[in-house]
Swiss-Prot record:
Keyword Protease attached: no
The protein's name: Amphiphysin
UniProt KW keywords: Coiled coil, Cytoplasm, Cytoplasmic vesicle, Cytoskeleton, Membrane, SH3 domain, Synapse
GO cellular component, one term: synaptic vesicle membrane
Organism per entry: Gallus gallus (Chicken)
CDD domains in the record: BAR_Amphiphysin_I_II, SH3_Amphiphysin_I
Gene name of the record: AMPH
Location of the region described as Disordered in the Swiss-Prot/TrEMBL record: 244-310, 446-470, 501-530, 561-606
Function: May participate in mechanisms of regulated exocytosis in synapses and certain endocrine cell types. May control the properties of the membrane associated cytoskeleton.
Length: 682
């Protein structure tokens, strides 16, 4: 018995050695290898089929586990409802019965899925291990076949032929070939059949799953409807104890889409900077989202973001000294465009109250003054451009005169004399220059009667604003007069003590001497109504980008301020319009000559039906062919819209100025764009 076991063991070891030797020879290329490419393809399909079936089995078990979890959760939910149900409430027994039936449905659904799908899938996958074993055994028999064949060939090709050994080798070769052919034939028939049957198995499995799930949902929907009816009757029984949630959506009808844009919640403007700190940071809002096109029931365009506000760091040396005083009380009186002004109150502040950020970069002063009207502009005209808000020119801070005008060319001696006179003069005796007031009255006339000469005068004023710096180096007298006009364009806010702060030329003194004394008093009184002394000026946080847009924003603000202030004027101020307008036109004659075209020529070059210009504040990407692709800083010429629905929804029709100047075709290049992505220029 022991000898028999030893013989079998030795025989198996010999087979393993022969197979290993044959594989080594085949790897080294010293022995050829029998290959069946078609069978190898069958093996690859078998491996793929086994992997797909294993994954399907794994996911189906996870699905069944989820069903079991839903069964437990549903059971606990109905049990908790039954526990809180009062005995005198309607449908107590019905609720209990519905819960029990729901649990039975979940259990039946789970069991049928296990019997009809999971067990079938397990049976389907059960045949793969056996086939896999037979494939491995066939591979070993193929090696034995190659080994026997090589051994027989070696004996037949040897010089010394041994017929006995050759005969024995032939018998072994035939035996190995027979065993290999048996495995190979069976697998050649079974593997393709198994691969083709996978389609029918998938169909039957998922048909069973879908039918069971549909039946389950249909039956449990009836129970849910019964529970809904019980709850409805319970609510009718206790109608006086109804519980409503404010703001909860109702299912009484479809949702209504509003076409008009809803403005954001505006922060109420501060009555005065002393009422609350004027150096607080405004909350930043995200970039506006792209609105929908008008063909898709577009709503109003979104709200542009609010500008960030930071305190200015450009304080004079005298102001810094006063800040460290224990009794530092800044007298702030910011004039708003509204007529109902709230009387200012004084608030004791210290340097610790100011929110200075030492990590913000220093901003170079540009000499441009913003009107405080920009703090109370409507929400759809706010911008996030890097326009700098500087202290008002020719203003006084705590009684000390400041000269911040960048357009007047003065020597060091003149500046010293001016500061000395401002310090010695009493605050009540200081007068305001008449040039800003006259320019404001002139703007009132321009808004009231927009004829062609007046528009040319406005174009001349804008041209003078751009070229005053270059002319100031050549003709100081013309520069001084133009600086007064530019001060009006830059800001409507004029300090009460700013009149003596600027050096007047001989021409201005002569012009003032010709005016009646009564008119001069009226101008002083009306100018004092809008004067202010801002001590802490806020500016938008920026990186000095978009400074080229300053001029347009300032012109827009000053025109709005002039329209508000013009209603408070007297008849005596209106009588000065003619003389002041002529003086302004004479002052601006030199820079206006350099303009390439007049306002009349520009109007003739506009597209048909031109209304006004707007500047794009945010990038807008068109979603439809009837919309414009806009980038920040583009100028758009607005023309009448074809439908009023677009205007009501907050959309405008226009053509980009660059495309109009290049193609002169409004019909081909016009398109829609959101109005609150832009601001008006004229």
């Amino acid at each position: 018995m022991a000898d028999m076991k030893t013989g079998i063991f030795a025989k198996n070891v010999q087979k393993r050695l022969n197979r290993a030797q044959e594989k080594v020879l085949q790897k080294l290329g010293k022995a050829d290898e029998t290959k069946d490419e078609q069978f190898e393809e069958y093996v690859q399909n078998f491996k793929r089929q086994e992997a797909e079936g294993s994954r399907l089995q794994r996911e189906l078990r996870a699905y069944l586990a989820a069903i079991k979890g839903m069964q437990d959760a549903s059971k606990k939910l109905t049990e908790s409802l039954h526990e809180v149900y009062e005995p005198d409430w309607y449908g107590r027994e019905d609720v209990k019965m519905i819960g029990e039936k729901c649990d039975e449905l979940w259990e039946d659904f789970h069991q049928k899925l296990v019997d009809g799908s999971l067990l079938t899938l397990d049976t389907y996958l059960g045949q793969f291990p056996d086939i896999k074993t037979r494939i491995a055994k066939r591979s070993r028999k193929l090696v034995d076949y190659d080994s026997a064949r090589h051994h027989l060939e070696a004996l037949q090709s040897s010089k010394r032929k041994d017929e006995g050994r050759i005969t024995k080798a032939e018998e072994e070769f035939q035996k190995a070939q027979k065993v290999f052919e048996e495995f190979n034939t069976d697998l050649q028939e079974e593997l393709p059949s198994l691969w083709s049957r996978r389609v029918g198995f998938y169909v039957n499995t998922f048909k069973n799953v879908s039918s069971l799930e549909a039946k389950f949902h249909k039956e449990i929907a009836l129970l849910c409807h019964k529970l809904y009816e019980v709850m409805t009757k319970l609510g009718d029984q206790h109608a006086d104890k109804a519980f409503t949630i404010q703001g909860a959506p109702s299912d009484s009808g479809p949702l209504r889409i509003a076409k008009t844009p809803s403005p954001p919640e505006e922060v109420s403007p501060l009555p005065s900077p002393t009422a609350s700190p004027n150096h607080m940071l405004a909350p930043a809002s995200p970039a506006p989202a792209r609105p929908k096109s008008p063909t898709q029931l577009r709503k109003g365009p979104p709200v542009p973001p609010l500008p960030k506000l930071t305190p200015t760091k450009e304080l004079q040396q005298e102001n810094i000294i006063n800040l460290f005083d224990d009794n530092f009380v800044p007298e702030i009186n910011v004039t708003t465009p509204s007529q109902n002004e709230i009387p200012e109150t004084k608030k004791v502040e210290s340097l610790l109250d100011l929110d200075f950020d030492p990590f913000k970069p220093e901003v170079v002063s540009t000499g441009v003054t913003h009107s405080p009207m920009s703090q109370t502009l409507p929400w759809d005209l706010w911008t996030t451009t890097s326009e700098l808000v500087q202290p008002a020119s020719s203003t006084a801070f705590n009684g000390f005169a400041q000269d911040t005008t960048a357009f007047a060319v003065q020597s060091n001696e003149n500046v010293t004399e001016t500061l000395t006179e401002a310090e010695e003069a009493p605050l009540g005796e200081l007068k305001v220059e008449e040039t800003p007031t006259a320019a404001v009255v002139e703007k009132e006339a321009i808004l009231a009667e927009p004829d062609e000469p007046t528009e040319q005068a406005a174009e001349s004023i804008e041209a003078g604003d751009k070229e005053t710096t270059g002319i100031a180096e050549k003709e100081s007298e013309v520069v001084s007069a133009a600086g007064g006009a530019v001060a009006v364009e830059d800001s409507v806010v004029v300090a009460a003590g700013a009149g003596e702060g600027a050096v007047r030329t001989e021409q201005e003194a002569a012009a003032e001497g010709d005016k009646p004394q009564g008119e001069e008093k009226d101008v002083d009184v009306s100018q004092e109504k809008v004067s202010s002394i801002p001590s802490v000026v806020i500016e938008p946080a920026s990186n000095n980008e978009g400074e080229g847009e300053e001029h347009h924003v300032i012109m827009n603000e000053s025109k709005d301020a002039a329209a508000e202030m013009g209603t408070q004027g007297t008849d005596s101020e209106t009588s000065q319009i003619g003389s002041e307008q002529k003086a302004t036109e004479e002052i601006q004659t030199t820079p206006s000559q350099d303009q390439p075209a007049s306002a009349g020529d520009t109007a003739s070059d506009m597209p048909p039906g031109f209304l006004f210009k707007v500047e794009v504040l945010h990038d807008f990407e068109a979603a439809n062919s009837d919309e414009l692709n806009l980038k920040r800083g583009d100028i758009v010429l607005v023309i009448p819209s074809e439908t009023t629905a677009d205007q009501e929804a907050g959309w405008l029709t226009g053509i980009k100025e660059s495309e109009w100047l290049q193609y002169r075709d409004a019909n081909s290049y016009k398109g829609l764009f959101p109005e609150n992505f832009t601001r008006h220029l004229e």
